[in-house]
């Protein structure tokens, strides 16, 4: 699994597998946010199966599915609240990591210099 650190608190990846929970625990992740709609995931990666794997590992789970055509202020706010209401490691995933990054950028990018974002 390729993990990308957007900030010390917010990490992303593309596809997350149930067998990756030990790695998330070692990273100190306390919340996982799934941005991948069930309609584009294989059955073994559907949100409820992932919720089970994540919560069995003692990590909180939130489902905030986003498609490239469904971005909305409400979805951005839900993602933002999930990050701000957590004191330490948040891990978001979708198919490639792009939507997780965009959700973060819509709310937080203005707080950083452009050269830090590129």
Where are the regions a protein language model picked out?
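Cys-dependent protein tyrosine phosphatase-like superfamily
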Residues: 1-91, 99-118
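Short cysteine clusters
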Residues: 94
